[in-house]
Amino acid sequence: MRLLTEGAEIIIQELGKAEFEETAYERISDLLKEGLIKRFEYTHQLAWNVMKDYEEYQGISPIMSSRDATHQALKIGLIDDTRWMNMIDNRNLTADTYNENTATQVVKEILQIYHPLFLKYEETINRLLIN
């Protein structure tokens, strides 16, 4: 989570503000986009693996994929936002091909949607660990 947060903060600083107009995303350098997308990909991988481990610990199995883990996490209340399912689609899209327009759109969604979802998920997991 920390590395994704650092990447998001670098981009926000480069653009000079937290709320971006639509064209601002196109001004982000390709290197920053690629870096943020990579950090998003492995943060997503870690997140769904933690979901899977928690679900298996709770006796829920078999969990075979990120889609299974995410669906179960929604079902048991580990996460509460269905945009996690969209996250899987974007993660698969960025892993399979690189397209500048797609990258720009995914970066926008990472900054506006997915990063906050990861932070909320981290809080949930930390709360579960304390209890």
Residue ranges and their predicted role:
Residues 1-131:
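Solvent-exposed interaction patches of small proteins and small membrane subunits
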